[in-house]
Amino acid sequence: MLDFNIKDENIKKGIQNINNIARLQEITAGNLKNLVKNNLFLISGDHNEDGARVLNDYLQSLDCNKHIIVGMMANKDHESYIKCIKNISSITTVDIPNQPNAISGKELKDKFKHLPNVKYAESVEKAIKSIKLNRGDLLIITGSLYLCSEVLNLN
């Protein structure tokens, strides 16, 4: 076995500096953040039932109105995913650009039609502009790492 002689203190510092992109990542600046203004703006590439449960646990720990923009790949279990997300003020489905294996935002909206306050927007930017955010509200974009990548590129 190799002995790298790494001190515990260095391991702790390394762990504290891990940056997990698109996993409850806060967007603090940029073009899309400017649309969200002073509200908390997150992206999280959760795309399955387990990820949705963890996301929901986090969202339920927050005392604010929560707005979700969601786009997903066609091969995911959309119904199981959205069943895990509770107490959401609005859900806006979107298309994921340049992803032929994504479900269209319109189809996703149809799958979520049993939920209140579900709408469709053609793009992330249009979705953000369509949501009435009050002071202190949260906006999270989720459902696919591809969608989160698009957000980072647009921002």
Spell out what each predicted region is.
Residues N38-F41, I82-L138:
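C-terminal helical cap/extension that packs against the catalytic core
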Residues L147-S149:
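Short, active-site-adjacent cap segments at secondary-structure transitions
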Residues M1-S90:
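Nucleotide phosphate-binding/pyrophosphate-handling subdomain across enzymes
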Residues S144:
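Active-site-proximal loop/hinge segments that shape catalytic or ion-binding/gating pockets
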